[in-house]
UniProtKB/Swiss-Prot annotation:
GO terms for biological process: carbohydrate metabolic process; glycerol-3-phosphate biosynthetic process; glycerol-3-phosphate catabolic process; glycerophospholipid metabolic process; phospholipid biosynthetic process. It catalyses: sn-glycerol 3-phosphate + NAD(+) = dihydroxyacetone phosphate + NADH + H(+); sn-glycerol 3-phosphate + NADP(+) = dihydroxyacetone phosphate + NADPH + H(+). This is Glycerol-3-phosphate dehydrogenase [NAD(P)+]. The gene is gpsA. Its main location: cytoplasm. Pathway: Membrane lipid metabolism; glycerophospholipid metabolism. Disulfide bonds: none annotated. PROSITE patterns: NAD_G3PDH (PS00957). InterPro entries: 6-PGluconate_DH-like_C_sf, 6PGD_dom2, G3P_DH_NAD-dep, G3P_DH_NAD-dep_C, G3P_DH_NAD-dep_N, NAD(P)-bd_dom_sf. NCBIfam families: PRK00094.1-2, PRK00094.1-3, PRK00094.1-4. It is found in: Cytoplasm. It comes from the Bacteria. Its EC number is 1.1.1.94.
Length: 338
């Protein structure tokens, strides 16, 4: 692939890691953020120590606070900002951009109040004459591993296969590999909803439960993620892939996962306010829990794990009581996404 110019909106852990992948592939990378001290650190010291204490970035990765300068003559834009500000940043991009580009996003969540997927938000806010079909970049990927060039395999999903293939070529190299998919709904819902299950899996660990329980929450969590996704129009097969069960495993079993760590702290009795203050990063699973719970209620989809986590986070239900309420639910058969 010829050298491309890519704007990465969001200098967090994942935005930084993906910037390095793109730079390794010979592309011009411009990171945009709104914290001058962080942008200055990236440009002066080539570090982003809030997220990666021991990583030195290539000096060709340049960071900006000026959005117009960031977007000038770019070929593609990658959104990697928190879910709650995606719409605002998209509006700013729409007001600034003056040519058509490939639009990608690598964030995982649902908009808190509207329950909308992020590709829907980008489609609503960025006019068609300025963008391609949206491409979702998602899958089992800890930034802490990608930044040190550990093997990572994820998915590029778009309604337009050729656009997904462009993104596949843009990112893929000897340590980072993308597969294409056209099921945008499935890939996005899998990426968003697995954060909820990761909170639950972490809570089980914090409470001292063993591997049996942790395996069960991943398997049954995948079942209810699939139920909601299918109700929204996704293919059930997507949830057996990298962006589905793959992402759920990596997020629901690892200390690298901020959602897992948040659940672990909840299980050990810490308050949600203290957890959010100590984490120093956005915990998407918290806001996504409310959005998914309300969406499931609206669509009549059975999601007992999500409901239990919602009750714990937003209504102060005792975690162990919530767990044993699930254990005492009506007996059911198990099938494809029962």
């Amino acid at each position: 692939m010829e050298k491309q110019t890519v704007a990465v909106l969001g200098p967090g852990s994942w935005g930084t890691a993906l910037s390095q992948v793109l730079n390794d592939n010979g592309h011009e990378v411009r990171i945009w953020g709104n914290l001058p001290e962080q942008i200055n650190e990236i440009n002066t010291h080539h570090t982003n120590k809030h997220y990666f204490k021991d990583v030195v970035l290539d000096e060709n990765i340049i960071a900006y606070t000026d959005l117009a300068e960031t977007l000038k003559d770019v070929d593609a834009i990658l959104f990697v900002v928190p879910t709650k500000v995606t719409r605002l940043v998209a509006q700013q991009v729409a007001q600034t951009l003056d040519h058509k580009v490939i639009i990608m996003h690598a964030s995982k969540g649902l908009e808190p109040d509207s329950h909308k997927r992020l590709s829907t938000i980008l489609e609503e806010e960025i006019p068609e004459h300025l963008r391609s079909d949206i491409v979702v970049v998602s899958g089992p990927s800890h930034a802490e591993e990608t930044i040190v060039r550990d093997l990572t395999l994820i998915t590029a999903a778009s309604k337009d296969l050729q656009t997904a293939q462009y993104v596949q070529k843009l990112f893929s190299n000897h340590y980072f590999r993308l597969y294409t998919n056209t099921d945008v709904i499935g890939v996005e819902t899998a990426g968003a909803l697995k954060n909820i299950i990761a909170v639950g899996a972490g809570a089980l660990h914090g409470l001292g439960f063993g591997d049996n329980a942790k395996a069960a929450i991943i398997a049954r969590g995948l079942a209810e993620i699939t139920r909601l996704g299918v109700a929204l129009g996704a293919s059930p097969l997507t949830y057996s892939g990298l962006s589905g069960v793959g992402d759920l495993i990596v997020t629901g079993t690892s200390i690298h996962s901020r959602n897992w760590r948040a659940g672990d702290a909840l299980g050990r009795g810490e308050s949600l306010a203290d957890i959010e203050a100590n984490m120093g990063m956005v915990i998407e699973g918290i806001s996504t829990t409310r959005a998914a719970y309300e969406l499931a209620q609206e669509l009549g989809v059975y999601m007992p794990i999500t409901q239990a986590i919602y009750q714990v986070i937003y209504h102060g239900t005792n975690i162990k009581d919530a767990i044993y309420d699930i254990m005492n639910n009506e007996f059911k058969a198990e099938n494809e996404w029962s």
